[in-house]
Amino acid sequence: MMETKEKVVYPRYAVIRLRGIPTTPRDIATTLHLLRLRRKFTMVVVPGTPSIIGMIQKVNDWVTWGEIDADTLAEVLKKRGRIVGDKPLTLEYLQKWGWQSFEEVALAYITGEIDSLSCRKVRVREGQRPPCIPYLKPFFRLHPPRGGLNSVKLHFSVGGDLGYRGPLINDLIRRML
C-alpha cells in the first residue's frame, strides 16, 4: 500500500524592505534581490519554509516581517496589485481566470489552497482555474507609512521598526496602502 504525502501548509509572511541601497553588504544585497526586495518600501508575500525563514533572518536588519492575514492581503491585491505591463490588477482580470473576488484569492493563498500568488504561463483546462494569478508581479510597491516610522536602526522589540513583528505587520501594511 502506497503512502500519500500530506501537503504541508506553511504560514504566509509579508516582508517589507525598510532600508535603502547604499552601503548594503554584497551578501545582504544578493539575498534581498532573491527575495525580490529591490527597492525601499517594497513588499513580498512568501511561505514560511525553512529556507525562506533563513533568508529573512539573514536580512533582518533591512526588513520587517510578520504573518499577514487574508483581509490585508485582499486589500493589497486590490490597491497595489500589478500585472505585467504595469497595469493594475482588476476584478475583471481575476474573473477572466476564474476567481470571483480578491478576498477569494487571498483566502485561498493563506489557507494553502494555492502555493503561489503569481506565475507566468499557465495552461488551464476548461472549467478549472489556475493555481495562481497569471502574470501578477511578485512584489508590491507601497507608500511610506502614514505617521512615519519610529526608527529604521532599531528592532521592533526595542521600539524600532526592523525585524519580526508578528500579526502587527497588518497595521503597518494598512498605513502604507
Curated annotation (Swiss-Prot):
CDD domains according to UniProt: Ribosomal_L7_archeal_euk
Top-level taxonomic group: Archaea
Gene Ontology biological-process annotations: maturation of LSU-rRNA from tricistronic rRNA transcript (SSU-rRNA, 5.8S rRNA, LSU-rRNA); translation
UniProt keyword annotation of Ribonucleoprotein present: yes
Ribosomal protein recorded as keyword: yes
Keywords on record: Ribonucleoprotein, Ribosomal protein
GO cellular component term, pick one: cytosolic large ribosomal subunit
GO molecular function: RNA binding; structural constituent of ribosome
Description of how the protein assembles with itself and partners: Part of the 50S ribosomal subunit.
Listed PANTHER family: 60S RIBOSOMAL PROTEIN L7 (PTHR11524), LARGE RIBOSOMAL SUBUNIT PROTEIN UL30 (PTHR11524:SF16)
Family as reported in the entry's similarity comment: Belongs to the universal ribosomal protein uL30 family.
NCBIfam families per record: PRK06049.1, uL30_arch
HAMAP family: Ribosomal_uL30_A (MF_01371_A)
Name under which the protein is recorded: Large ribosomal subunit protein uL30
Annotated organism of origin: Pyrobaculum islandicum (strain DSM 4184 / JCM 9189 / GEO3)
Lineage, opening ranks: Archaea, Thermoproteota, Thermoprotei, Thermoproteales, Thermoproteaceae
